[in-house]
């Protein structure tokens, strides 16, 4: 009798791609979508319902694309993470993009609060935490004194949270400046990833402070203008297309990819559930025989049927 492979652990509550691979959690391989997402357009907005894998896909993109800033050209971390996954079969794409890009990746989920003051504060905290990932740029010989001074402002939590005109100016310019700093240091235009871009606006609309919030968010998103010389690609995810009051004023010719568009990128598909989960998952997670496979397959289909 052939010995059965040990069951993989099913993990919920984490959206970090690297943890799935590092700790051996069960992972449905969707890395074949990295190239369609990356090649779609210089400015791409992906719209999907909640729990559709958007955040995990953005995490996967970051781990695939982001270069080793200490050792540019070293892709050993990516080689280990993506070994045996579908994207590794696309050698041309991997050689051109795996570990080759500076990346700025941020989620605006925490900025969805019930009052303007709390939303703005959480947005400021999000920017502060993001900026701390790039504190090492203070030692870059390629940045001028003005750029380093602005970076110090981004690292000043009290300044960001203060809420006056100076504070708003730093907050609104934060993404543009982080991209500029990385561009000047690395000599490569970074990829900008914004997850849950619409979350603070949804809460603002529901709680009647949309006009206040849009005055902060609109300048923040000016980084996405195609005239911006400091980013190569901008990829956003969310549930809704926020068009009220011109949030994307000046941003022309960007691509929207939703479940209604003909060129949609299927982050979840019926055949993924049918074959990827109901077949592969049962064998790897611990199913035994066709009866168990049918039972788990039926449960998977029932859970995902609203999205087929």
Language-model features: locations:
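Positively charged, low-complexity/disordered segments
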Residues: 291-308
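Phosphate-binding site recognition
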Residues: 1-295
């Amino acid at each position: 009798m052939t010995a059965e492979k040990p069951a993989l652990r099913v993990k919920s509550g984490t959206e970090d791609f690297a943890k799935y691979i590092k700790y051996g959690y069960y992972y449905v391989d969707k890395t074949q979508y990295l190239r369609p997402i990356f090649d779609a357009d210089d400015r791409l907005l992906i719209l999907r319902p909640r729990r559709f894998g958007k955040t995990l896909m953005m995490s996967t993109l970051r781990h695939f694309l982001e270069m080793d800033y200490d050792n540019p050209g070293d892709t050993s971390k990516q080689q280990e993470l993506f070994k045996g996954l579908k994207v590794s079969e696309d050698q041309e794409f991997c050689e051109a993009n795996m570990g080759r890009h500076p990346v700025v990746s941020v989620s605006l989920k925490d900025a969805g609060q019930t009052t303007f003051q709390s939303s703005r504060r959480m947005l400021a905290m999000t920017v502060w935490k993001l900026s701390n990932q790039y504190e090492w740029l203070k030692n870059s010989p390629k940045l001028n004194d003005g750029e380093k001074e602005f970076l110090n402002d981004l690292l000043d939590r009290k300044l960001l949270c203060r809420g006056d005109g100076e504070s708003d100016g730093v907050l609104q310019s934060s993404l543009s400046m982080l991209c500029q700093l990385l561009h000047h240091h690395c000599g490569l235009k970074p990829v900008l990833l914004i997850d849950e871009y619409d979350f603070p606006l949804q809460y603002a609309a529901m709680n009647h402070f949309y006009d206040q919030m849009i005055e902060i968010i609109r300048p923040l998103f000016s980084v996405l203008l195609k005239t911006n010389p400091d980013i190569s690609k901008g990829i956003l995810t969310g549930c809704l297309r926020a068009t009220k009051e011109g949030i994307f004023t000046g941003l022309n010719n960007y691509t929207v990819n939703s479940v209604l568009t003909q060129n949609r990128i299927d982050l979840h598909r019926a055949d993924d559930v049918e074959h990827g989960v109901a077949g592969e998952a049962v064998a790897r997670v611990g199913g035994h025989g066709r009866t168990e496979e049918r039972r788990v397959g039926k449960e998977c289909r029932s859970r995902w049927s609203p999205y087929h």
